[in-house]
Amino acid sequence: MTPLRILPAAAALLLLLLTTAAPAQNGKKIYADYHGVRYTRAHDGKLGRWEMHAETAKSKTGRKRLCYNADFTDAEGRHDIAAVAYPQVGMQSNLDPDYIEYQILSAKAAGIDGFFIEWGFMDHENDKLLRAMQPVAAKYGFEIGVNWCDGWLYYDWITRMHPEIDTREAKTEHYARCYQYLVDHVLSGPTAPVVNGRPVFYLFGPGAKPAEYAYAASKVRLPEGMAQPAVLRRWAEWGTLENDRYVPVRWSPEIESWKELGMIPTAWLPARVRPMDAAHPHWDHYAEPDDLIEFMKPFRDSVWMSADPAYTVKSGFVMPGMDNRGCAGWGGQHFYYIPRDGGRTYERMWEFSMASRDSLDMVFIASWSDYTEGHEIEPTVENGDRELRTTLHYAAQFKEMPEDTSGIALPARIFDLRKRSEYLASARRKTADADALIDRAAAAVASGDYAEAGTHIAAAETAVRALETTLKNRTLEVPESELRFSSDAVHGIRYASPELKVYLPETVTRSLIAARAHTGYVEFEYFDDAPTGDFVFLYSRTERQPKDIFATVAKFKTDGTGAWKRVRVELIPGNVLYDMNPGFTLLFKGKLKLRDVSFHYTLSR
């Protein structure tokens, strides 16, 4: 095992000369930050970052709170997610292998080589996300790295999981263990992110201080033959606004202290220093497109164009825009905005990096999936696949590869087929032939053979449609008048405090049991009363383990609009128990007024 060390200048220069002697396209990579974890009731029994409830009274915008009840859907099936844009394939679980496949194939088709998952420490939920992604990435020739948010380790998050790690010294010792874990399981192996023969990761901070990092790094041992990792250290100091012109920070003692440890200053989201004005009433601060370019110039001047041999991997940086109305600064109660400008902002960021492309080894994108901060490039309803096409356009220049856009739309078709086949299988249809075609299509997309992939997709769509025609479907509508409740309505209004049980008619329950497969939702109106700070819960009986997780059908809060709101909540077949034993179907629990409850199903045989 080789100790992790800071490369001396001479050794770094030699390694730099050796790695840059390879053909340019072999040494250049594109990675995208990956933000999670987002879940679904169907896959995980919870929602994760799709939901958000937070106070924002400190914001100067006048907005008092965030209330994104992601269990709620509208009449089109769109969930109330914590984001300003909606995923093109709908609200999915980051841990669903089909969704992971879709994202990886979409990224590959756009010229992206890997994801850097925002990661804090071993056994955190983001570590589970990392481990879920690795086998799919290995299957399709994709790389999985980390954007190490080591602040998570120094917050009390680690102490909640490991009470014995309760001092800064103990956290630094665990930092070393986490670093070794990354070396052994992320920075080496078939999915390791490697640029010019060197493993690389992004260090977001703001956790370890330089001395603590140096101590932890001194305890790490590298596998035999592994090159010293390149560490891209976030440098995103704020800058100032002078005479209506953004002026960036060009030097700071903090970044110098990290450079002394061999780290490479790398950009993150550009500063937003312009205060709210009449044209931007929804955000406390914003940036103009020109500000982004000014923000990037110090990286070009002091890192990209530098002959410093310690800069072994130089990374450009791009992002499409920002609108953090999904989170308001993660407790900071501050709304930020960078306009996408119809895709032009992303193009300008790429153009700035490409002007120095001969000096760059990689480009880092922020981000693939940060819906809450609103800088995702994953296809959305609002923006389509525009950002993926832009990524591919510049990836072709950067990596000297063909710009073949015919693969961009194929992963979404594959994902759609996966889900349709899944439903058919639940209805006891034999889907093996269709699934084999879908598998071949996915493999063809991963290898860049889009014509072959299209052929397999077309054949799979024909096979799936043929199976769908064999389904015998019928709808089942159950109005409130046919339901039984544990308490009577008062002037047409029912109260969920302390609880309200709802019972389906036996005939409906028998029909659901007899159906081979079904989809369904419960619809109701609730009075959006003054917030209490407490959640209202909707439970079912369930046999799915762990029951305390999968028994939750929905949880939500009121937002204080003083209006009646009509919503729908999905009833996940594998989660909700329907049987003939005595017991409720659903149970509302919390301070809530509701009315006009009804159930709606589509049954398949």
Which stretches of residues belong to each language-model region?
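Glycan-recognition and processing domains
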Residues: 469-516, 530, 544-546
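Glycan-processing catalytic domains of CAZymes
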Residues: 25-472, 570-574, 587-594
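Exposed low-complexity, polar/acidic, P/S/T/G-rich flexible segments that act as propeptides
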Residues: 589-605
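Extracellular carbohydrate recognition and processing domains
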Residues: 544-578
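Extended extracellular/luminal ectodomain segments enriched in beta-structured repeat modules
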Residues: 514-523, 579
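Beta-strand acidic-aromatic groove motif in beta-rich domains, primarily in extracellular
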Residues: 530-542, 580-582
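Bacterial N-terminal signal peptides
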Residues: 8-18
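Solvent-exposed strand-to-loop "edge" motifs in beta-rich extracellular domains
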Residues: 523-531, 572-574
